[in-house]
């Protein structure tokens, strides 16, 4: 992707080119007729929008100015996962483990220079997470079914340029019981 901008009444000009290779790999192995094991790697990109890149300085409030950063790179999110699945008429089970990370997240930050608040953007964000998830469907009888779906994760967010960080556990569980009446 290529961006180019010229401004009327301004000597500023900027351009940005994004040539991102976005790989994706998946391997699958059938352990038995009803069981499989999958491993995958995926990368997603998030390209900065024009306002993130635009170097034009908004001085409508002289005590707080904002401008873009034409040197921003695409944010790259990487994900590795392993999934086991087992399916039969009575039980369906899916268990997944996933590790995801971003080392160049696009973040807005502000700083004071010469008594003026400056706001702009940079690739200063970092995040990583480890996720475990489980899906279970149990057909207890032809008229009775039980489902449970759960996920737990440890997440770690950091902003190197701002010396900010946050980490902790998160999760959710959903269950259902279905009974068909005569």
Task: Annotate each predicted stretch with a short phrase.
Residues 27-29, 43, 84-86, 136-138, ...:
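Residue-level signature of outer-membrane beta-barrel architecture
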Residues 26, 30, 36-40, 77, ...:
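Membrane-spanning beta-strand positions in outer-membrane beta-barrel proteins
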Residues 35, 78, 84-86, 144, ...:
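Polar/charged side chains located within well-ordered beta-strands of beta-rich proteins
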Residues 1-28, 33-78, 99-119, 143-154, 178-182:
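Surface-exposed extracellular loop regions of Gram-negative outer-membrane beta-barrel proteins
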Residues 18-24, 65, 75-77, 127-129, ...:
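Membrane-spanning beta-strands of outer-membrane beta-barrel proteins
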Residues 69, 73, 88, 92-174:
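Outer membrane beta-barrel strand-and-loop segments of large Gram-negative receptors
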């Amino acid at each position: 992707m290529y961006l180019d901008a010229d401004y009327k009444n301004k000597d500023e000009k900027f351009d940005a080119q994004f040539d991102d290779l976005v790989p994706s790999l998946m391997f699958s192995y059938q352990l038995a007729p009803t069981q499989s094991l999958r491993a995958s790697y995926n990368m997603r990109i998030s390209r900065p929008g024009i306002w993130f890149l635009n170097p034009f300085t908004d001085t409508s409030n002289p005590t707080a100015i904002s401008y873009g950063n034409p040197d921003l790179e695409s944010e790259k999110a990487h994900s590795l996962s392993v999934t086991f699945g087992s399916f039969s008429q009575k039980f369906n089970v899916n268990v997944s483990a996933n590790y995801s990370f971003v080392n160049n997240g696009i973040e807005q930050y502000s700083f004071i220079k010469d008594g003026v608040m400056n706001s702009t953007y940079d690739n200063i964000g970092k995040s990583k997470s480890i996720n475990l998830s489980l899906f279970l469907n149990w057909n207890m009888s032809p008229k009775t079914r039980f489902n449970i779906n759960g996920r737990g994760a440890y997440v770690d967010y950091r902003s190197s340029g701002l010396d900010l960080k946050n980490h902790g556990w998160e999760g959710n569980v959903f269950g259902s019981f279905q009974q068909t009446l005569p």
